[in-house]
Amino acid sequence: GTVIKRKVNQKTLELRNNELQFSMLTEQNNMQVVNAKQEREVTKKTVETTTEQIELAQTIYEQTLLQQKQGTASLTDVLLTDNALREAQQTYLTAVIDYLKADLELKKLTGNISLNN
């Protein structure tokens, strides 16, 4: 009787331990999903911001070109604004990549990755 009782107690403890581990993993996954959603939202805002930066840099570049034609801006000014526009475009591309990574991570965590052939 005592051997069986001990085995039952041991199995009960193992079952409880497994339940706790499952609960911990579930909470950990839920936390990762929340973090991934927040990361995706942050990167989405960054894409929006960098889009606005490109528009601004484009406007400044066009104004500088016009000023150069009128003789009020130098070639150096044009090159500087051209460089600023290119930097804004590069920053935008990096932001898009970061967004896609965050979106993929969220899909991975939630099991929403579809493989279309």
Where are these regions (language model features)?
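Sec/SRP-type N-terminal targeting helices
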Residues: 1-59, 94
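Short, flexible micro-motifs
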Residues: 4, 74, 114
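Acidic, low-complexity, intrinsically disordered peripheral segments
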Residues: 29, 91-117
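Canonical tetratricopeptide repeat
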Residues: 36-37, 75, 96, 103
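Charged, solvent-exposed structural "stalk/scaffold" segments
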Residues: 42-94, 107-109
